[in-house]
């Protein structure tokens, strides 16, 4: 359990879904923290010092403890501050949350973003592949307010920071609705529920500014191929 007097700092990047989800967890737990904005293309001396292995955000500094990788940080936060749990207590349910969270970051993320830079199979095929993956989450959230049940939890933070506010906005750059409501009614209901949660709204980048930045990132990435 965390001590009363402590120091919590978070190194993040304003459009990074990985640092946004960590902020959601800290806010849900009511943990006071200092946010340090990073300019990832330049990588500050502090970031390289605190995360020499991956050289990326998020990095959580809790007193003298350093943590990187968003899933690791989320679990640490949940185990350190016991209020408002974000992971279920049941071992099987907890394992399934971890499974789907990895699915979002390790399966949906690369398949969802790479075609924006280089669609080797064509855009139409890429869209179909992405939507096939999203359909798994559509089924998983059916009949629930959130993946975590009545309140947001670990998977809501992982999927919520990635799919509606990152993946969907990236495809909007091409004028494509990646999650049409007639195909994904449950995901869209879940997204609406997310938008009603204050800590989620506080952590999501402004839409127009976000899309403009993503357009630049996509164009820069295209120039490397």
UniProtKB/Swiss-Prot annotation:
Residues 6-85 form the GST N-terminal domain. Pfam families: GST_C, GST_N. Residues 90-217 form the GST C-terminal domain. Keywords: Cytoplasm, Detoxification, Phosphoprotein, Transferase. Glutathione binds at residues 16-17, 42-43, 56-57, 69-70. Disulfide bonds: none annotated. It catalyses: RX + glutathione = an S-substituted glutathione + a halide anion + H(+). The keyword Kinase does not apply. CDD domains: GST_C_Tau, GST_N_Tau. May be involved in the conjugation of reduced glutathione to a wide number of exogenous and endogenous hydrophobic electrophiles and have a detoxification role against certain herbicides. Its EC number is 2.5.1.18. One of its GO terms (cellular component) is cytoplasm. PANTHER family: GLUTATHIONE S-TRANSFERASE U2 (PTHR11260:SF559), GLUTATHIONE S-TRANSFERASE, GST, SUPERFAMILY, GST DOMAIN CONTAINING (PTHR11260). It comes from Arabidopsis thaliana. The modification Phosphothreonine is found at residue 151. It is found in: Cytoplasm, Cytosol. This is Glutathione S-transferase U2. Belongs to the GST superfamily. Tau family. The gene is GSTU2. One of its GO terms (molecular function) is glutathione transferase activity. One of its GO terms (biological process) is toxin catabolic process.
């Amino acid at each position: 359990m965390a001590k009363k007097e402590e120091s919590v700092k978070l190194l993040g990047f304003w459009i990074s879904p990985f640092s946004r989800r960590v902020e959601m967890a800290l806010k849900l737990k009511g943990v006071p923290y200092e946010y340090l904005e990073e300019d990832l293309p330049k990588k500050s001396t502090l970031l390289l010092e605190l995360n020499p292995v991956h050289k990326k955000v998020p990095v959580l500094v809790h007193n003298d403890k350093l943590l990187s990788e968003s899933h690791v940080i989320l679990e640490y936060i949940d185990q350190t501050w016991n209020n408002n749990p974000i992971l279920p207590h049941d071992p099987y349910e907890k394992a399934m949350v971890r499974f789907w969270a990895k699915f979002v970051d390790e399966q949906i993320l690369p398949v969802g973003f790479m075609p924006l830079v280089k669609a080797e199979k064509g855009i139409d095929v890429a869209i179909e592949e992405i939507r096939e993956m999203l359909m798994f989450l559509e089924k998983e959230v059916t009949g629930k307010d959130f993946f975590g049940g009545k309140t947001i939890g670990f998977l809501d933070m992982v999927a919520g920071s990635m799919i509606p506010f990152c993946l969907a906005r990236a495809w909007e750059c091409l004028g494509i609705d990646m999650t049409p409501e007639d195909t994904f009614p449950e995901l869209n209901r879940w997204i609406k529920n997310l938008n009603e949660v204050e800590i989620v709204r506080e952590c999501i980048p402004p839409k127009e500014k976000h899309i403009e930045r993503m357009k630049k990132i996509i164009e820069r990435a295209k120039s490397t191929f």
